[in-house]
């Protein structure tokens, strides 16, 4: 029996719509878990005690005398639940390190491969991805380049540049440390360098601290979690600083 033209058209339309629908539906990407602080041990309660600063305000540190940071970051979250991205080479670099929220994610040696790629198999919500280049494979402080801007997944699950907007004010507890060592970014710890929770304040962020001066986020700490930053002061000045609740201003 011949099928009426209207029925033939309806059947073809239905099949076409079904096929189009099957092409338009992308694999579901599971929701990412919240990012956790890297230190899982106990952190003592640190109530505000008050204190005072050094008197002379600290100026902004100069971090320009290093290899430039890698750029041209491109990638995002895939259907496999991993974040994968590529980045551009830096002239003079022998290797690179990638970080998620201030924690080492991947070491990339440059042996001339066509593409430099980073993969995060365990991504989390609003993670800050950052990179630096190295002049040598030994990760010595003198070989480390400048830290890149942070990159976060946008609404389309693609990586996009991220920074805390200039002028943002943050009500934080501010503590002080006096360790004579290297910061996580390989700078000699000293005035103007600060430790942050890199989930909230990415490395490389500059901000002012009342009574202290200018801070450059270049370090992390086991007890530096959530609304705490740690400023560097020498010797007894660190003790005299105490624990203060202050309003930070992002530069």
Outline where the language-model segments fall.
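Beta-strand signatures of extracellular beta-sandwich domains
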Residues: 95-99, 206-208
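Solvent-exposed, well-ordered loop and adjacent helix/strand elements within mature globular domains
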Residues: 34-62, 125-126, 151-251
């Amino acid at each position: 029996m011949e099928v009426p033209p209207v029925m033939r058209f309806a059947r073809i339309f239905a099949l076409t719509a079904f096929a189009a629908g099957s092409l338009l539906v992308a694999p579901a990407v599971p929701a990412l878990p919240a990012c956790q602080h890297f230190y899982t041990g106990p952190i003592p309660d640190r109530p505000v005690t008050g204190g005072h600063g050094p008197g002379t305000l600290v100026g902004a540190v100069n971090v320009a005398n290093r290899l430039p940071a890698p750029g041209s970051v491109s990638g995002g979250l895939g259907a496999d639940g991993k974040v994968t991205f590529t980045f551009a080479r830096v002239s003079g670099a022998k290797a690179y390190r990638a970080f998620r929220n201030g924690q080492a994610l991947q070491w990339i040696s440059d042996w001339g491969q066509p593409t430099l790629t980073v993969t995060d198999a365990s991504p989390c919500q609003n993670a800050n991805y950052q990179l630096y280049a190295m002049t040598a494979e030994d990760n010595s402080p003198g070989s480390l380049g400048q830290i890149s801007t942070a990159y976060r997944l946008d609404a389309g699950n693609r990586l996009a540049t991220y920074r805390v907007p200039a002028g943002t004010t943050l009500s934080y507890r501010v503590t002080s440390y006096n360790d004579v060592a290297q910061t996580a970014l390989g700078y000699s710890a000293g005035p103007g360098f600060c430790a942050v929770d890199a989930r909230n304040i990415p490395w490389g962020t500059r901000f002012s601290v009342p009574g202290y001066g200018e801070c450059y986020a270049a370090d992390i700490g086991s007890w530096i979690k959530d609304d705490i930053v740690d400023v560097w002061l020498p010797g007894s000045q660190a003790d005299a600083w105490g624990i203060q609740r202050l309003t930070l201003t992002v530069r």
